[in-house]
Design a protein with these regions (language model features):
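Active-site/acyl-donor-binding loops of N-acyltransferases
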Residues: 12-23, 82-85, 150-172, 299-350
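Conserved acyl-donor/pantetheine-binding loop and adjacent beta-alpha core of acyl/acetyltransferases
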Residues: 82-103
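Short, high-confidence coil segments that cap the C-terminus of an alpha-helix
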Residues: 62-64, 129-132, 241, 296-299
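Short terminal hydrophobic/aromatic SLiMs and anchors at protein ends
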Residues: 7-8
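Non-catalytic accessory segments adjacent to catalytic cores
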Residues: 115-159
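Aromatic (often tryptophan-rich) hydrophobic motifs at membrane interfaces
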Residues: 72-75, 99-101, 106-108, 115-123, ...
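A conserved beta-strand-loop-helix scaffold within acyl/acetyltransferase catalytic domains
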Residues: 12-72, 76-88, 140-162, 172-276
Length: 350
């Protein structure tokens, strides 16, 4: 049977739901919209962490929500989603979209993760679909996980590509193409240096530089400048993120931001002044810096966050593959708030 129990504990926990899930004990779902309401939670996945929630919460233009599943008072799973504005070239020009990186994090091996995710997914969809034009699940570790739940909640999948560099079997330099080796060596000989940002001014200068680089790519979303500062300084006791800089004669000409979670590093944003300083290859060094750092720190993989669609030529994917990574197939799941549009796309893609 299904036992429902709704109540409000605090004003910022706007919905709690109790379900059975064919488990011995009922599961309660809580939605947190304010960081100071979130209790201490287990977990090591940065994309569903309280730390990343705080970064989104303090960054202009983002609205995070964290759904936590409990059995009794014990958390057994959580999922972090964030709503942001998106500017499009076609109507509607400005929309709100909800993005989720992965499918959550789960702590009780005795529970059926697929069933638990299905309940969290239904809860999330009901929570955000009224205020988001689009819900997107991206960067899935296992593209098959949750298939039944996604389809039950009227999501459709689009095939995507994933690019990862292995760091555990051989040195990154050995994986580079010959042309990439020459470019890196030439840039370093010409005076370019790579370092980690350790002060406020460098992070601000890096953010402004990267924003200009992204402004020429209309489809690329770029967060408020404060996002990078917050991410870099959030919880210094943990290695959550690093800002890598490429400098020439003291000026920042390139850089990247990399997240760290479990045994993997994730390159989120990168870029450089490649036209002005072409002979220094700042865009290449901006990628090379986190690769070498992750290798030296013992991470097993470095993943590029957006490798693109499999049936479309993608300049960035071709660029990063020359660092020795391998591409594999994955998917992204989407749900539109317009029922007629979502139904049409479900028929087309399913």
């Amino acid at each position: 049977f299904i036992f429902l129990h709704k109540y409000t504990t605090r004003m910022w926990i706007d919905k709690q739901k109790t379900i059975n899930l064919q488990l011995e004990m009922p599961v309660r779902l809580s939605t947190y919209r304010k960081g100071n309401a979130i209790p201490p939670l287990p977990g090591t996945n940065i994309f569903h962490s309280t730390e990343l929630f705080h970064v989104f919460e303090m960054t202009r233009g983002y609205e995070p929500l964290l759904i936590v599943a409990y059995i009794g008072n014990r958390p057994v799973g959580k999922l972090l989603a964030v709503i942001r504005k998106s500017v499009r070239l076609f109507p509607p020009a400005i929309i709100k979209r909800c993005e989720i990186y992965g499918t959550g994090e789960y702590f009780d091996e005795a529970q059926n993760k697929e069933d638990l995710f299905g309940e969290i997914l239904e809860h999330l969809t009901n929570e955000v679909l009224c205020k988001s034009f689009l819900i997107e699940f991206r960067n899935l570790e296992n593209p098959l996980f949750g298939y039944k739940a996604f389809r039950k909640n009227n999501y459709f999948a689009i095939n995507w590509l994933r690019v990862r560099n292995s760091l555990h079997s051989k040195a990154p330099y050995e994986r580079l193409s010959m042309s990439r080796r020459r470019q890196i060596n030439k840039a370093l000989r010409n005076g370019a240096i790579m370092e980690i940002a350790d002060n406020e001014k460098d992070i601000q200068d890096f953010s402004r530089m990267l924003k200009k680089a992204y402004s020429s790519q209309i489809r690329k979303h770029f967060p408020d400048i404060g996002f990078f500062r917050l991410l870099a300084w959030q919880n210094p006791e943990k290695e959550l993120a690093k800002v890598f800089l490429v400098k020439y004669k003291g000026k920042i000409i390139g850089g990247s931001i990399c997240l760290f979670s479990k045994e993997s590093a994730y390159l989120w944003f990168s870029g450089g002044m490649r036209k002005t300083y072409a002979f220094l290859y700042p865009g290449i060094l901006a990628v090379w810096a986190p690769i070498t750092y992750a290798y030296e720190k013992g991470y097993a993989h470095l993943e590029f966050m957006d490798a693109g669609l499999p049936f479309k030529k993608h300049g960035y994917r071709d660029f990063v593959l020359r660092f020795g990574g391998k591409q594999s197939s994955t998917r992204r799941w989407f749900r539109f708030s317009w029922k007629w549009l979502n139904k049409l796309l479900c028929k087309f893609y399913i």
